[in-house]
């Protein structure tokens, strides 16, 4: 794992050390740059495999091809002997060394041959061509910015902000979508001119030409050809694939830990790891002090302890309190470099885990694969539609946004309202549903969220918040062979008779008791709604005070004030709190990045 940064073309070579210095949290063990005519590629390294010999960037035999990556290539053990058999000379045990040699054999098709979580950069000097690529699921981030005759790239936005002359201009369209989704959807970023490379895409750059961005892999949710009427056979196949996926994620020369929330996803990952790991595993649970125990989190802790005892793990419990959230918010926002109002509990658990391990395995991706959210239950007809939620699936999905387009427009100042005329997050949702491969209602919503919410929100918070503490997180549910198999299953195996994640629960029943499996989902969430409505009220009101909103003039202060009042009025609901929280986080972000 590492952070990468650099440029292709006529870039400023002196900017690269400054770019990399902002990424030391992603790679505190080493920093190295390789540069030449029309390129510079640098990497900060978190040493996990071949600790002594795996320094990046790496080259082919004659140094003509240079490559670096952020991530892990899980098919490295099978690819390495193939390259050796073809006459390539590999001098380390690191997976990154595959890249320059594989480029020599397959060129721009390189991403199709590697499997794992990665963001990579390759420069071929003789051919004068550069390649950027991002993994299939979107686990690892990669941003790029065109300036003059150069294409700059980096693992995080902060590295691009370090380039001399970078202009920090707010992307109003990205802001508009953020207020609906709680995150900025790719390929947008909050800064004008900067793009995020989408998951499963590559970018090919030749000096003097426009970069070419193309998809190299697509996940199909179309029904598979094999019969799925034999439920035990489906469970057998799923567990076999999951067992292999967990095994691949144990590849490391340093200690590994496991997230263990007490829910099915992380518990099953832990159970499978206990079967295949060569030694006793470490598990970690986040708990909440005080009032949080009244909203179900005590059940999470109880079941996490049960799993830890059942599989004899080296178990650790870490506790956070209400005051930890506002005091850490600016550090959290610096991890994202963008406003982000999604889950941030990973920050606190990763902070504690990093004191014990360098690598962690988590259960993220299971909700989006098997169906767990309100939108999934609505699609299955497992929950009656609330008033006004009838219509096409994309339409009622749009109604689940934190703020509608109309609500946002009501808050905007006249200038912003005019600048955003014609921009619609509702239309953004509709367009996402237009290109789906799935036909049954559950899989249609799962596919839409797989393309959007998973990489833009779930995997974003997992990566940024863990890597801010130099902790690499791996996800067994996001293994390619697991994902492709589950995507091919009908929605009726994912949500059945109102039960979410049906086939996953049936699989977990081979390991856990019924009362654990069938209990209500809590999720890896902080009790932020209760905190905002309770002890955080002074902080919310102070952050959204008129004098602070005047720093940018984007919103009408009286209308924002009225929204805040509704949060603290009798009968306030989760959605109302989320609207105010999205504004609070944007305000904090603005003051940090654009307020001077």
Q: What annotation goes with each model-predicted range?
A:
Residues 1-335, 509-510, 515, 553, ...:
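Cysteine-centered catalytic environments shared across enzyme families
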Residues 1-4, 85, 162, 171, ...:
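Adenosyl-5′-phosphate
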Residues 138, 370-395:
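A mobile, often basic/glycine-rich helix-loop segment
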Residues 236-257, 352-356, 360, 453, ...:
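Phosphate/ATP-binding catalytic cores across multiple sugar-kinase/actin-like superfamilies
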Residues 313, 338, 454:
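Short glycine/serine/threonine/alanine-rich loop segments
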Residues 330-334, 375-378, 531-533:
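Short low-complexity, flexible loop/linker segments enriched in glycine and/or proline
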Residues 344:
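Divalent-cation
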Residues 357-367, 371-373:
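Short acidic/histidine-rich active-site segments
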